[in-house]
């Protein structure tokens, strides 16, 4: 069992026969009245998001999520193919189960495939990836006095904001959880 007061991003639990993952949470302590936890939850089966408020003492059964390392092979339009690194079995997954999780992942990289009771519902990319900048405008010295950013396209086709000193051909580290530039490699 997990109490609502212990919620963190990524926690999964069962509620009304469904499995939800906490996307956002906020502990609220109003001046008058009891404290509560405001959450944004994602139904891991349907992908729908809902907002729900809990009492911090509410308890729900924790959902056991299996995470298995698999190699992302390729996509052929609507299906994305992953290979089990131990048994070499291939697993096709539809875009509806993956969402934007692969926008920073290159082919042949290892990702975690998430499942509950044998039903695959999504993937988890590595927390940090290193990608090459394939397109960005040149930054000029003296453009700004503060840390300004410019748009850049990385080798997977995703768009990201980078500092002005990053140029085409640079390798950069990206946090896949937030989609933010971390550093130049």
UniProtKB/Swiss-Prot annotation:
Q: What is its main location?
A: cytoplasm
What gene is this protein translated from?
Answer: efp
Subcellular location(s) per record: Cytoplasm
Q: Name one Pfam family in it.
A: EFP_N
Identify the keywords attached in UniProt to this record, alphabetized: Cytoplasm, Elongation factor, Protein biosynthesis
Family under the similarity heading: Belongs to the elongation factor P family.
Write out the transmembrane intervals.
none
* HAMAP family the record matches: EF_P
**PROSITE patterns annotated for this entry?**
EFP
Question: In which pathway is this protein known to take part?
Answer: Protein biosynthesis; polypeptide chain elongation
Which GO molecular function annotation, any one, does this entry have? translation elongation factor activity
| GO CC list | cytoplasm
| Task of the protein | Involved in peptide bond synthesis. Stimulates efficient translation and peptide-bond synthesis on native or reconstituted 70S ribosomes in vitro. Probably functions indirectly by altering the affinity of the ribosome for aminoacyl-tRNA, thus increasing their reactivity as acceptors for peptidyl transferase.
The GO biological-process annotations, alphabetized, read as: peptide biosynthetic process
Q: Which domain of life is it from?
A: Bacteria
Q: Which InterPro entries match?
A: Elong-fact-P_C, NA-bd_OB-fold, Rib_uL2_dom2, Transl_elong_fac_P/YeiP, Transl_elong_KOW-like, Transl_elong_P/YeiP_cen, Transl_elong_P/YeiP_CS, Transl_elongation_fac_P
> What PANTHER family does the record point to?
ELONGATION FACTOR P, ELONGATION FACTOR P (EF-P) FAMILY PROTEIN
- Would you tell me the protein name for this molecule? Elongation factor P
């Amino acid at each position: 069992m997990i109490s609502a007061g212990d919620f963190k991003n990524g926690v999964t639990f069962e509620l009304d026969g469904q499995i939800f993952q906490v996307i956002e949470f906020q502990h609220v302590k109003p001046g008058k009245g009891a404290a509560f936890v405001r959450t944004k939850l994602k139904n891991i089966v349907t992908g729908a998001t809902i907002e729900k408020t809990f009492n911090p003492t509410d308890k729900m059964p924790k959902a056991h999520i299996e995470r298995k390392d698999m190699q992302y092979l390729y996509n052929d339009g609507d299906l994305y193919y992953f290979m089990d690194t131990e048994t070499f079995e291939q697993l096709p997954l539809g875009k509806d189960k993956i969402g934007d999780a692969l926008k920073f992942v290159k082919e042949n990289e290892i990702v975690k495939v998430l499942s509950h009771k044998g039903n695959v519902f999504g993937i988890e990319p590595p927390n940090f990836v290193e990608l090459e900048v394939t397109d960005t405008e040149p930054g000029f010295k003296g453009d700004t006095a503060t840390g300004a950013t410019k748009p850049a396209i990385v080798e997977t086709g995703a768009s990201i904001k980078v500092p002005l000193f990053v140029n085409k051909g640079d390798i950069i580290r990206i946090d896949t959880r937030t989609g933010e530039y971390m550093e130049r490699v």
